[in-house]
């Protein structure tokens, strides 16, 4: 066993050795909790400060949750004893929690594309219960106590989602993942290449995930924009993706994740601004689509470009800008005039811009844009 799974087993042995007063078993169990706190190219903490489980699969949440739960719990037990977590491992834990894990959380909710198959479980994006991890870190890593206190305040909603959030941009070169953080919003991009696995559907969970890893994006201000939306989503229209509108969503041949087929996926960052590029290529006969896509990250805008879209699919190919909960009205440009749309389904001819929930979508070229604002229904268990 590795990573989070190993930690769960070791916790059992810690309790058992304490009850039986077996010091040798206790030391072995604690070592098994702390030993995964190293950078690796296998499952576990990656050199880019991301986290992998089930092979080369991004799992900042989900299995990332589990290893943080176990490690912070045992580290708090061992504080001040001969088993105390050493300085180097504390630094790794601190860096991952402050600069990756909690940066993917906006307000109370985590980005949907870093939790793996957990996205198909009700309520799993909400990370309020992880205040326990941050609370433990105040004692384990007192040098960053103020940061953990701010994290706790945001998670408890005693402070707004932008409270003490500072600007940052990170491209996780191991995980094929870009995260852009501003006090006003978060924006991320998840890719899949021949180096990284696509999101899994093991245990018959997350059965509609096929396009999830193909350049999907989150844009969040409060963090509630996608919370529990997934039963009513159109999974052919995952935000950021370019995909044929197939009648039935395909499934990868292996439930626990398969490597992507794109050979070009990457990004650059100076820690504040960045760019990400992706030569999307899916050779599945049901899809057989490719596109060149890129994202450029600034303070108040993200520029998303697409070119060279080719497909042999018999279905129309759509690029989805966003698919989130409807909030208030939608304001659109119609021939230079502003118009507020009623609920319904629209085909807009060459709108210059669309405004929804304080986010403006600008279309520099004259394009046909499909827009829906309506009630949708669905179920969790047919996912």
Enumerate the language-model features and the residues they cover.
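Aromatic-lined, polymer-binding surfaces characteristic
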Residues: 1-121
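Extended polysaccharide-engagement surfaces of secreted carbohydrate-active enzymes
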Residues: 67, 74-383
């Amino acid at each position: 066993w590795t990573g989070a799974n190993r930690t769960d087993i070791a916790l059992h042995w810690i309790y058992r050795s304490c009850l039986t007063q077996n010091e040798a078993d206790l030391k072995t169990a604690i070592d098994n909790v702390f030993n995964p706190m190293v950078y690796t190219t296998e499952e576990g903490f990656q050199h880019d400060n991301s986290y992998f489980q089930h092979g080369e699969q991004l799992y900042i949440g989900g299995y990332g949750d589990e290893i943080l739960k176990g490690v912070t719990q045992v580290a708090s037990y061992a504080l001040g004893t001969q088993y105390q977590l050493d300085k180097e491992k504390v630094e790794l834990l601190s860096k991952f929690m402050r600069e990756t894990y909690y940066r993917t959380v906006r307000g109370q909710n985590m980005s949907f594309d870093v939790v793996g198959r957990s996205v198909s479980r009700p309520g799993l994006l909400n990370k309020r219960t992880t205040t326990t991890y941050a609370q433990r870190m105040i004692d384990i890593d007192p040098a960053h106590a103020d940061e953990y206190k701010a994290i706790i305040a945001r998670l408890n909603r005693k402070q707004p989602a932008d409270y003490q959030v500072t600007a940052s941009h990170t491209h996780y070169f191991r995980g094929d993942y870009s995260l852009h953080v501003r006090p006003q919003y978060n924006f991320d991009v998840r890719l899949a290449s021949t180096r990284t696995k696509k999101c899994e559907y093991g245990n018959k969970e997350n059965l509609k995930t096929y396009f999830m890893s193909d350049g999907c994006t989150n844009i969040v201000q409060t963090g509630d924009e996608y919370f529990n939306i997934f039963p009513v989503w159109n999974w052919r229209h995952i935000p950021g993706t370019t995909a044929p509108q197939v009648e039935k969503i395909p499934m990868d041949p292996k439930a626990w994740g398969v490597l992507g087929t794109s050979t070009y996926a990457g990004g650059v960052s100076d820690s504040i601004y960045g760019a990400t590029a992706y030569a999307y290529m899916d050779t599945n006969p049901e899809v057989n689509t490719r596109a060149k896509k890129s994202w450029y990250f600034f303070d108040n805008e993200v520029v998303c470009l697409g070119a060279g879209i080719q497909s042999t699919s018999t279905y129309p190919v759509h690029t989805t800008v966003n698919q989130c909960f409807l909030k208030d009205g939608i304001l659109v440009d119609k021939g230079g005039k502003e118009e507020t749309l009623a609920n319904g389904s629209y085909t807009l001819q060459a709108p210059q811009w669309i405004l929804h929930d304080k986010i403006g979508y600008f279309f520099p070229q004259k394009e046909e844009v499909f827009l829906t604002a309506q009630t949708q229904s669905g179920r969790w268990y047919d996912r």
